[in-house]
Design a protein with these regions (language model features):
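PLP-dependent amino-acid enzyme catalytic core
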Residues: 1-344
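Short aromatic/basic micro-patch
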Residues: 35, 257, 356, 389, ...
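Terminal peptide-recognition signature
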Residues: 87, 110, 169, 275, ...
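Bateman (tandem CBS) regulatory domains
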Residues: 251, 334-354, 407-418
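The conserved cystathionine-beta-synthase
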Residues: 355-374, 380-382, 399, 419-438, ...
Length: 465
């Protein structure tokens, strides 16, 4: 735990050295360890806090920003907050342009810092005068004593990550990081971190995620020769309809596209299973990170995904079931067995993922095991295979009828094995399997059995929703 043993001169000193947290529940069945760098621990709640101060410092050094001046920027919200924090300390005004798809939480947050916020249409080409970046350029040009932060073409952006985020990851992993996963918006983070990590170890792989509808992944695949047409998407703060100057495509080893639905589903899982309250872009990044970890399948590898911002900025969107359904991003019940198992494990203390009994164990041992773990049924496992099942009711009834059976082997009197279902199957569909003859189901992830769900687990879930 970080200890703040000395006072700080101001809030800017708290930016950086965010914690690296292992993902445990969403990685169930994956051998490769995956860690998230929790950038929402920055004072402004996002990774963009890292670039606000350096951009302003650069403008001051170059003489472009003078006392009482105005900082102008086109932002999806987070860079605006990073700039607004530094501007508040230095006495500058801020004017921000934002596309209309951004959450109201972000708009209100920027206004809370005293910034003027101008909303622009999302569905316009990158070179259209009403595009949020183009409008910011015009406002900066027309406003006396104003500078454009210009995060999409400002070298201070990737340099900040080269000097801070990259070294932090290297030190926190003791140089063991093998894969870094992020998503390009301006490209500053993935470029700066990627350059630093590859300088330390050229074998480190830099993997980028991209929303379906952004052109960046296709531009990378075609080495800039393609002319893809962008399309609207809901994930905020990442993806582009043109390649930013701060994105070094050559640093990226692979680009993967992810849908809004996949991104938001993963963000909600991270909140409910890992206790990490994150935004939609984090969901996209972790979705890619898990894909990479499965593909690598090496417990000695180490995947680091930066988690850009807090979920507090999306309460009206991805954490609003009504908004999700209106945008066809949420089914009637999106809860999967992975979520249910995560809650069960968190509430269940030290109980193993699957409490089982071997076929050669005695009935007496099976009953003691059920009593010890406060369960009423057990799968009978022969190695990694479920070959049968027993229940306290069945064993008790048979033992009362014939006391000698207490010392008989479980394999002699076991019942049929429990059904096996996949971890991504919906809770509602599995509920139908938990009939009188099926008191439990075993849950499979990536080919191996990872958990058990009983009728009691299902009833607890149904009563809570």
């Amino acid at each position: 735990m970080q200890r703040h043993t000395k006072p700080y001169e101001n809030v800017l000193a708290l930016i950086g050295w965010t914690p690296l947290i292992r993902l445990n529940k969403v990685t169930r069945g994956i051998r490769t360890p995956v860690y998230g760098k929790a950038e929402f621990f920055n004072p402004g709640g996002s990774i963009k806090d890292r670039i606000g101060g350096p951009i302003i410092d650069q403008a001051e050094r170059e003489g472009r920003l003078k006392p009482g001046g105005t900082i102008v920027e086109g932002t999806s919200g987070n860079t605006g907050v990073g700039l607004a924090i530094a501007a508040a300390l230095k006495g500058y005004k801020c004017i921000f342009t934002m596309p209309d798809k951004m959450s109201q939480e972000k708009v209100r947050l920027l206004k809370a810092f005293g910034a003027e916020v101008i909303i622009t249409p999302t569905a316009v080409p990158a070179d259209h005068p009403d595009n949020y970046v183009m409008m910011a350029r015009r406002i900066a040009h027309e406003t006396p004593n104003a500078v454009l932060a210009n995060q999409f073409y400002n070298d201070a952006n990737p340099q900040a990550h080269y000097e801070t985020t990259g070294p932090e990851i290297w030190e926190q992993t003791e140089g063991r990081v093998t894969h870094f996963v992020y998503a390009a918006g301006t490209g500053g983070t993935i470029t700066g971190v990627g350059r630093y990590l590859k300088e330390k170890n050229p074998r480190v792989q830099i993997i980028a995620g991209d929303p379906v509808g952004s052109i960046l992944a296709e531009m990378w695949r075609t080495k800039g020769e393609g002319k893809p047409e962008g399309a609207p998407y809901k994930v905020e703060g990442i993806g582009q309809d043109k390649v930013p100057g701060t994105l070094d495509m050559g640093i990226v080893d692979d680009f993967m596209t992810v849908s809004d639905k996949e991104s938001f589903a993963m963000a909600r899982r991270l909140t409910r299973e890992e206790g990490l309250f994150v935004g939609g872009s984090t969901g996209l990044i972790v979705h890619v990170a898990l894909h990479v970890a499965r593909r690598v399948d090496d417990p000695n590898a180490l995947v680091v995904a930066a988690l850009p911002d807090t979920g507090e900025r999306y309460l009206s969107k991805l954490y609003n079931d009504e908004w999700m359904r209106e945008n066809q991003l949420l089914e009637a019940d999106r809860t999967t067995l992975a979520s249910l198992l995560g809650v069960k494990s968190r509430d269940g203390g030290e109980m193993p993922v699957i409490v089982s009994v071997a076929p050669g164990a005695s009935v007496r041992q099976a009953l003691r095991l059920m009593s010890l773990h406060d369960v009423s049924q057990l799968p009978v496992m022969d190695g990694a295979n479920c070959i049968g099942s027993v229940s306290d009711w069945s064993l008790s009834a048979k033992s009362l009828a014939d006391g000698k059976l207490l010392d008989a082997s479980v394999g002699q009197i076991m019942d049929a094995p429990f059904p096996i279902v996949d971890v991504d199957q919906s809770v509602d569909s599995v509920a139908k399997l938990l009939s009188k003859s099926n008191p439990a189901v075993l849950v499979r992830s990536n080919g191996s059995l990872e958990g058990i769900v009983t009728r009691s687990d299902m009833l607890t879930y149904m009563m809570a929703r």
